[in-house]
Amino acid sequence: MEMKNIFVALFISAVLVSSVSAATMESPAPSPGASSASTVAFPVVGSIVAASLSAFLALLLQ
């Protein structure tokens, strides 16, 4: 049972990391004009959410 919990936690962490890395892939160049800081901060917020969810899941499965 312990190995199953570890496997599930690692699997979900890997899924979260891959989803965050997919969100940070190259995008087309921004158009000239007003730029938004939220587009720059989105990958950071995504990685924080993924780390928080994986930590919660690890505590839940402990």
From Swiss-Prot:
Tell where it localizes: Cell membrane
Protein's job? Proteoglycan that seems to be implicated in diverse developmental roles such as differentiation, cell-cell recognition, embryogenesis and programmed cell death.
Quote a single Gene Ontology cellular component term: side of membrane
UniProt organism field: Arabidopsis thaliana
Transmembrane region(s): none
Q: List residues with covalent lipid attachment of type GPI-anchor amidated serine.
A: S35
In the induction comment, the record states: Up-regulated by AHL16/TEK.
Instruction: Please give the name of this protein.
Output: Arabinogalactan protein 40
Task: Kindly report the protein's main subcellular placement as a broad class.
Answer: membrane
Modification comment: Contains 4-hydroxyproline; hydroxylated on Pro-28, Pro-30 and Pro-32. O-glycosylated on hydroxyprolines; noncontiguous hydroxylproline residues are glycosylated with arabinogalactan.
* Disulfide bonds, paired cysteine numbers: none
* Keywords of this entry: Cell membrane, Glycoprotein, GPI-anchor, Hydroxylation, Lipoprotein, Membrane, Proteoglycan, Signal
Does the keyword section mention Lipoprotein?
A: yes
As for membrane topology, the entry says:
Lipid-anchor; GPI-anchor
Q: Which family does it belong to?
A: Belongs to the AG-peptide AGP family.
Which of the residues bear the PTM 4-hydroxyproline? P28, P30, P32
Excised during maturation, the propeptide residues are: 36-62
Which residues are noted as glycosylation sites?
P28, P30, P32
What InterPro entries does the record point to? AGP23/40
Q: Does the keyword Magnesium apply?
A: no
Signal peptide (UniProt feature, chain positions): 1-22
